[in-house]
Amino acid sequence: MHARILIADDNRDAADTMGMLLELGGHEVIVAHSGNQALELGRQCRPDVVILDIGMPDMNGYEVARTARNEDWGKSAYMIALTGWGQADDKERARMAGFDRHLTKPVDPDLVEEILKGHLVGKRS
């Protein structure tokens, strides 16, 4: 099962690497390098899954998630926070912003694929 995935991270290497790994898994990947660009691309491509870095400079991941959840395309997207911040209050803040999952960097690509599979199987059943 494959998904259309939007990745947003201001660290170009991290975003591009994650994107390449997900493409190897058969997913369609769109990469953004800012929060504003993520919203723009989300409106255009209507992703199934959004993976957002929290610490982006122009618009952080919390703001992007809150904004997306209030837009038609973002209401049904599965949102994953991918961040270096992993304390309990960070996870709660992510949940309150509308994220479905919170993963702490560095993340195991196999874990991301496992989460995606679980989400896609659940979505189709």
Describe every region a protein language model picked out.
Residues 11, 54-55, 62, 85:
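The short loop immediately C-terminal to the conserved phospho-acceptor aspartate in CheY-like receiver
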Residues 26-33, 41:
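Short hydrophobic/Thr-rich beta-strand motif most characteristic of the beta2 strand and flanking loop
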Residues 19, 63, 70, 75, ...:
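Alpha4 helix (beta4-alpha4-beta5 surface) of REC/receiver domains from two-component response regulators
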Residues 107-116:
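C-terminal output helix
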